[in-house]
């Protein structure tokens, strides 16, 4: 994925857990007319912290381990996408996002796994081959590395 902010590295955003649901479909829209809006996992986390838990942006930014300004950009993007989907009768899908490095500290005892956030498919990670270069054999969506998310207690 190309970095839209050339020269600026993308940093890991900490999320508490992966979303349990990865797609929302509008009722009454013919399948041929369905359009997708894709929310990244960090955008969903920003919505959860700011809108569901009612956290101030500065506190939510600290929890996600990003700057206040970055949090503001993430939440603005997420709200715009959700509004577009609701007003336009579009499907909301939650997929990967702008996560470029492992947020985990230390070595994991569990074997590395590539997962599909769309359908939940899992496959073993092949060392030296990024998960994002593979597609899910069930739904065709991009796979991501399961260890890309850190848990916040």
Curated annotation (Swiss-Prot):
Matching InterPro entries: RNA_pol_sigma_r3/r4-like (IPR013324), UPF0251 (IPR002852)
Family designation: Belongs to the UPF0251 family.
SUPFAM superfamilies given in the database record: Sigma3 and sigma4 domains of RNA polymerase sigma factors
Coiled coil: none
Name under which the protein is recorded: UPF0251 protein CT0950
Pfam family, one: DUF134
Native source species: Chlorobaculum tepidum (strain ATCC 49652 / DSM 12025 / NBRC 103806 / TLS) (Chlorobium tepidum)
């Amino acid at each position: 994925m190309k970095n839209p902010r050339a020269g600026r590295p993308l940093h890991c955003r900490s999320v508490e857990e992966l979303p349990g649901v990865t797609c929302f479909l509008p009722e009454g829209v013919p399948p041929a007319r369905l359009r997708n809006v894709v929310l990244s996992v960090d955008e969903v986390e920003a919505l959860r912290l700011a809108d569901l838990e009612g956290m101030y942006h500065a506190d939510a930014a600290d929890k996600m381990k990003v700057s206040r300004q970055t949090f503001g950009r993430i939440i603005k993007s997420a709200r715009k996408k959700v509004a577009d989907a609701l007003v336009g009768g579009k499907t909301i899908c939650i997929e990967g996002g702008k996560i470029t490095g492992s947020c985990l500290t230390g070595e994991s005892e569990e074997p590395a796994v590539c997962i599909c956030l769309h359908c939940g498919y899992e496959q073993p990670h092949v060392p030296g081959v990024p998960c994002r270069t593979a597609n899910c054999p069930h739904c065709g969506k991009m796979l991501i590395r399961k260890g890309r998310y850190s848990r916040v207690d």
